Swiss-Prot record:
Name assigned to this protein: Orotidine 5'-phosphate decarboxylase
Function: Catalyzes the decarboxylation of orotidine 5'-monophosphate (OMP) to uridine 5'-monophosphate (UMP).
Gene name linked to the record: pyrF
Subunit structure: Homodimer.
Protein family according to the UniProt entry: Belongs to the OMP decarboxylase family. Type 1 subfamily.
Pathway stated in the Swiss-Prot or TrEMBL entry: Pyrimidine metabolism; UMP biosynthesis via de novo pathway; UMP from orotate: step 2/2
CDD domains: OMP_decarboxylase_like (cd04725)
SUPFAM superfamilies xrefs: Ribulose-phoshate binding barrel (SSF51366)
Sample GO molecular function, one term: orotidine-5'-phosphate decarboxylase activity
Lineage: Bacteria, Pseudomonadati, Pseudomonadota, Gammaproteobacteria, Pseudomonadales
Keyword presence, Methyltransferase: no
């Protein structure tokens, strides 16, 4: 049974172990999970995951694996062996890649992390997609990739809250993980397709990834408590 009682995932977007753990020590594992991304993982490797788990946190390993099917599946297997709660892959890697990842987790006898697909990054708008040869709205590409993820048997998707309602309608069994969440009054930063925590949950999101509004707050514990109160 999960120790965390909320849908909040706090992004530990730091370059060093000490900085990440300084924030983690101010947070309550009952009120949030934590996300380890590329910068922190590249700096600290698997040790940071073990340390966070020892502190009671469930860990979302946000490395967005994208490679040939076997290589990606072996990376997902390695993540599972670390004991992470959630791991993600890019849906644009295709059906065979995602299926291979799901199958390697099914072969495990122990706990299995949630396998989540990344659709379109929340920083991308139509002009960004056009730059890589896709002259369509982000939501159209999200729905295309979501259908592939569903077919491959993934547990859920990373998506903008603005796509959550359409995705829940089309794929109600998929769990939706939403970055780009900004509590009312927060700076937008480099996220483009964003909503507040309450708006995101109402739209169909299951988990909310929140970074700078908590990590850069003068009092991160209070900032987290404020978000918990907002969505209560």
């Amino acid at each position: 049974m999960s120790v965390c009682q909320t849908p909040i995932i706090v992004a530990l977007d730091y370059p060093t172990r000490d900085a990440a753990l300084k924030l983690a020590d101010q947070l309550d594992p009952k009120l949030c999970r934590v996300k380890v991304g590329k910068e922190l993982f590249t700096s600290c490797a698997a040790e940071i995951v073990g340390t966070l788990r020892d502190k009671g946190f469930e860990v979302f390993l946000d490395l967005k694996f994208h490679d040939i099917p076997n290589t990606t599946a072996m990376a997902v297997k390695a993540a599972a062996e670390m004991g992470v709660w959630m791991v993600n892959v890019h849906c644009s890697g295709g059906l065979r890649m995602m299926t291979a990842c799901r199958e390697v987790l099914e072969q495990r006898s122990g706990p299995k992390p949630l396998l989540i697909g990344v659709t379109v990054l929340t920083s991308m708008e139509r002009e960004d997609l056009a730059g890589i040869g896709l002259d369509i709205e982000p939501q159209e590409q999200v729905l295309r990739l979501a259908a592939l993820a569903q077919k491959a048997g993934l547990d859920g998707l990373v998506c903008s809250a603005l796509e959550a309602q359409a995705l829940k309608t089309a794929h109600p069994s998929l769990q939706l993980v939403t970055p780009g969440i900004r509590p009312a009054g927060s700076a937008q930063d480099d996220q483009r397709r964003i909503l507040t925590p309450r708006q995101a949950l109402d739209a169909g999101s299951d988990y909310l990834v929140i970074g700078r509004p908590i990590s850069q707050a003068a009092d991160p514990a209070k900032a987290l408590a404020d978000v918990v109160a907002e969505i209560a």
